[in-house]
């Protein structure tokens, strides 16, 4: 019950807080997007809600059509995964660094980027502020895509901004 209250509080705070999103760098071989919001929650509660990805990720941006099938195992080499049934599933990203309630880093190509010759580094930072926590979500992507990666920067920024 406490976890559900934390998640609900996180989601309500996000809905009420002004968010900031920007593609900070773009080139044919990659891009960086940064999304940030201040939530009315402690870093521990913000962290707990963030790693409960199945509770807040949009079902529109899943393979299964059901965000409840999404999960993050917040340990080194843990999985940001989506279950597709009894034995089927997708590894969207792999956890590469964990500092609970402070930072979570994942590596891989999210969504259609996972089908291309690219790699990404996604970092979620949690910083205590007066009255809440600043959640900063940075995703840097580089590699090869026919026609150039710059065309993916806007759509990826939109999806991540919608999630945050």
PLM region spans:
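Bacterial N-terminal signal peptides that target proteins for export
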Residues: 1-8
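Hydrophobic ligand-binding cavity/cleft-lining segments
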Residues: 19-71
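Hydrophobic-ligand binding "helix-grip"
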Residues: 22, 71, 85-132, 140
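A conserved amphipathic terminal alpha-helix motif
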Residues: 28, 134, 140-164
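Intrinsic-disorder/low-complexity, polar/charged segments enriched in Ser/Thr/Lys/Arg/Asp/Glu/Gln
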Residues: 30-38, 67, 79, 90, ...
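Hydrophobic pocket/interface hotspot
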Residues: 46-49, 80, 95, 106, ...
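Short beta-edge strand/loop motif at the mouth of beta-sheet-based domains
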Residues: 53-92, 101
């Amino acid at each position: 019950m406490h976890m559900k209250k934390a998640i609900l509080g996180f989601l309500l705070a996000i809905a009420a807080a002004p968010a900031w999103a920007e593609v900070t760098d773009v080139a044919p071989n990659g891009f960086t997007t940064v999304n940030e919001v201040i939530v009315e929650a402690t870093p521990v509660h913000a962290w707990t809600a963030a790693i409960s990805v199945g509770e807040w990720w949009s079902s529109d941006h899943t393979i299964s059509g059901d965000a409840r099938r999404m999960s993050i195992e917040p340990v080194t080499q843990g999985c940001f995964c989506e279950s597709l049934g009894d034995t089927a599933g997708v590894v969207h990203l792999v956890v590469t660094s964990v500092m609970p309630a402070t930072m979570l880093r994942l590596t891989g190509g999210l969504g259609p980027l996972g089908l291309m010759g690219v790699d990404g580094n996604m970092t979620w930072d949690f910083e205590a502020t007066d009255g809440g926590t600043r959640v900063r979500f940075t995703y840097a992507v580089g590699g090869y895509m026919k026609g150039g990666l710059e065309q993916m920067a806007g759509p990826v920024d939109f999806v991540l901004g919608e999630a945050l």
